[in-house]
Amino acid sequence: MKIAACVMALCAAVSIAGCSSSGSSGKAASGEVKETMRPYSVRQVVAADNEHGRTIMWQMTNGKEDSLEYRKAGSNDIRSVKAVSKELKGDKGVSDSFVYTARLDNLEKGTDYEYRTRQGNEVSKWYPLATDNGGKFKAIVTSDSQSSDYSDWEKLFKDAASRNPEAAFFIDLGDIVDNGQDEYQWQAWFKTVADTIDKIPVAPAVGNHEAYSLDWKETMPERYLTHFSLPKNGDDKLANHYYSFDWGDVHFTVLDTSLVEEKQWVPDLFEKEKAWAEKDITSSKKKWKVVLMHKDPLQYSFADPSRPAREEGFSDEGKEFMPIFDKTGVDLVLSAHLHTYRDRGHIYDFKRADHGPVYVILGLGGNVRYPGLWKRHALDEYVAPQPETDNYNVFEADDNQLVLSGYLPDGTLLHQTIVRKD
């Protein structure tokens, strides 16, 4: 099915003084409102600066003019920003919809807010929003949530969220869905995270499965690019492919590793991205530098003898990016893709070291399992018990250390990775 995601920049022009574009705010329109608006897939998305910004997105089956209203928690001073919309075709019983985006960029650090959507005199309920206070924090990290029916993923994510109610945001490291152009799967994923993503933001990375068409051919990850309006600090011509954001004293650099899948459309993706990544990481003044990427920098040999022989070593993505991570002083690299959870410790100049970035591949959050597929790599310091099941991770940052804890679905601790720096 060919996607007809036509970009209808319907700048929902609400009659609000001083409100000219998403991000610039004014007083909310006066008059009586009814809490009868029913947006779906309401989601917060990280901003580049989460002490003062946030992106809010939602979907409706009509393309009317929408706005976002917000206030400090408990306040009667309601502000408003315009929303812009993009039409998105449905499939498999999922209706056509409009994806709305509103950007907030004048928030106060460490402050509790509430927001709601508005269409005419109809409004949604209020949702909570908290800005980054600049201190220590916790985040939930998942990867490869792609699934056959998303029931295992639903239980895993909801349990992880309930065990970590203080999480400031969550990360999905790509292959968010099994087929990136299947809107039914996207809505299944959004339904799973619905009780969390409207309260705390997501920081997604694009995976190769986001770049497959419905007939399993390579394509641009159009639905991913539509569903997540990400910080505009990457390449203007490759908006939402790669980006960076800050939380606390950590700078996160999020990469697009789908070179093979996107090559016919963006043949120079890696060259552009490498130049951007080096500049992005070097320019950050944050104490900690963390890279998020879907495809893993290491290459593994197959344990299954029926598979073609393949030497262990480093993937094309690793060969391209690891020298940049060395050069720019990256502290931690989190990856996914191989559906296995392994800690490699410090690697520098493609060798085991006592310094340089720490590399961890995070396993899987969905139910597409590869039991016994990979041999142990010479650089592996920890390998999850085999055959592997799904898992989730919790990332914590404070002044002196980063802690990444991996858990089984029942909450049993698998492993901890600790990176310290004075």
Give the residues covered by each predicted segment.
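An acidic-aromatic substrate-binding cleft motif
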Residues: 122-173, 178-179
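Short acidic, glycine-rich surface-loop motifs adjacent to enzyme active sites
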Residues: 174-177, 284-304
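Solvent-exposed loop/turn segments at secondary-structure junctions
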Residues: 145-148, 176-179, 208-212, 249, ...
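Sec-dependent N-terminal signal peptides of Gram-positive bacterial secreted proteins and lipoproteins
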Residues: 2-22
